[in-house]
Amino acid sequence: TLPISFRKLLAGKLIVSAILSFFLGIVCFAFTVVANFIMGYDGFALIPALTGLVQMALLGFFLYLTMLPIIVLTSRYKGSFLVGFIVAFLYGFIGMFANGTLQSIYPVSAALGLINYRAGAEGVMWNKGLCFISILIMCAIGIALMFVKQKPEKREAKKTQHTAPKKGW
């Protein structure tokens, strides 16, 4: 056992995960720029590239915040990684179908609103206030779940097996 509470251990893991999600957004940007040069696309410009860097890094962080409740819940149970992965995938997949006002409310698509994602379309309007509130609510739920006390697991009494003494020598 570790001489640290589960809550502190979880908080440390969540902080490291937040930093990693931001960093992986930067890594995604780097791969995008490298792919741009490998494919030989024209029109690379520094200002849009820097805007893309900021957007991709923040998108990684905001998506982490939207998934925070799922991460906290699945961290409480042994062997629940796959369940958390499936739930997070479905949660993100449903976000592709959000449009209109729902687009600013649904947390996964609200992350796109906070980075001002346009998908190449003109006239895309995001309600940034709703986007911010949506992600803030998910973050608050995740933090609140961290402080909810976990039910103690029922432990079965270990039965000791007595071996019969060997006969003979």
Predicted regions and their residues:
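Residue-level signature of transmembrane alpha-helical entry/exit and packing/kink sites
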Residues: 51-59, 63, 80, 84, ...
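Functionally important transmembrane alpha-helices
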Residues: 65-96
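Terminal transmembrane helical anchor/hairpin motif
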Residues: 85-166
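Transmembrane helix-loop junctions in multipass membrane proteins, especially transporters and channels
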Residues: 29, 33-45, 79-83, 100, ...
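Short helix-to-coil transition segments within interhelical loops
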Residues: 1-6
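Secretory targeting signals
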Residues: 11-74, 118
